[in-house]
From Swiss-Prot:
EC number(s) recorded for this UniProt protein: 2.7.7.38
Species this chain originates from: Hahella chejuensis (strain KCTC 2396)
The protein's name: 3-deoxy-manno-octulosonate cytidylyltransferase
Pfam families, per database record: CTP_transf_3 (PF02348)
Cystine pairings recorded for this chain: none
Compartments where found: Cytoplasm
HAMAP family linked to this entry: KdsB (MF_00057)
Catalytic reaction equation(s): 3-deoxy-alpha-D-manno-oct-2-ulosonate + CTP = CMP-3-deoxy-beta-D-manno-octulosonate + diphosphate
Length: 255
């Protein structure tokens, strides 16, 4: 297994769930569950990156490590780059970005994405996907789709249904073409530190702006992104109050 560092960006502000990292799930703040999943991955080091003292206090309260960051980062990737500099990581080291609202993320996926990046030295980023089985998901703009080549490198990410089955999709009542597998992107990333340092020097690109997908900035610059099918289906994260109640119910049964 390759050595890697996990950084969990955590913000207190959320338009739909204020204070989301500190919301209680089965007697612990959400961020504690995310940290537990990170520990199960056997990462070399784990940090929560935040600009909020309340989150830092909670993390230190359960024995976690915290990196305090600036509050003006436009994205989680920019926050990771600051952390890499704070930790003085070498350019060839691997950092995995684990979202702070994924309390049930299987640890196997964290290790999978880190190992995939280590095994593909030509890539600057590695990420995961899962097969789409229904037309509703394929046409849902909140589900990001990805197309990859035979070597497992991303060709494009989009909120639109890609690739477009020209003849098949003319029938609005049809399901999915049986001759092609469509994939939904799973938002877990492993980065080479050198890429992170380059990323923050690049301005936003037109594709990133129109799709609102920051990984397109890397593609615009020609950075190869390795995409693998997730070894295990990941449960949905927590974006809404309904998500929170669903996760609470599931974790209450398992505790």
């Amino acid at each position: 297994m390759s050595a890697f560092t996990i950084i969990i960006p955590a913000r207190y502000g959320s338009s739909r769930l204020p204070g989301k990292p500190l919301l209680d799930i089965a007697g612990k703040p959400m961020i504690a569950h995310v940290y537990d999943r990170a520990r199960e991955s056997l990462a070399k080091r784990i940090y929560v990156a935040t600009d909020d003292a309340r989150i830092a206090e909670a993390v230190e309260g359960f024995g976690g490590s915290v990196l305090m960051t600036r509050a003006d980062h436009p994205s989680g990737t920019d926050r990771l780059a600051e952390c890499a500099d704070t930790l003085e990581l070498d350019d060839d080291e691997i950092v995995v970005n684990v979202q702070g609202d994924e309390p049930m993320l299987p640890a196997e996926l964290i290790s999978q994405v880190a190992n995939n990046l280590a095994a593909n030295p030509q890539a600057g980023i590695a990420t995961l996907c899962e097969r789409i089985h229904d037309r509703e998901t394929l046409f849902n703009p909140n589900a990001v789709k990805v197309v990859k080549n035979e070597a497992g490198m991303a060709l494009y990410f989009s909120r639109a249904p890609i690739p477009w089955a020209r003849d098949y999709f003319a029938d609005a009542d049809a399901g999915l073409p049986p001759t092609y597998d469509f994939y939904r992107h799973i938002g877990i990333y492993a980065y080479r530190v050198g890429f992170l340092r380059d990323y923050v020097t690049w301005g936003s690109c037109p594709l990133e702006g129109i799709e609102s997908l920051e990984q397109l900035r890397a593609m615009w610059r020609g950075v190869p992104i390795h995409v693998d099918v997730a070894a295990k289906a990941p449960p949905a994260g927590v974006d809404t109050e309904a998500d929170l109640q669903r996760v609470r119910a599931v974790m209450a049964k398992s505790s």
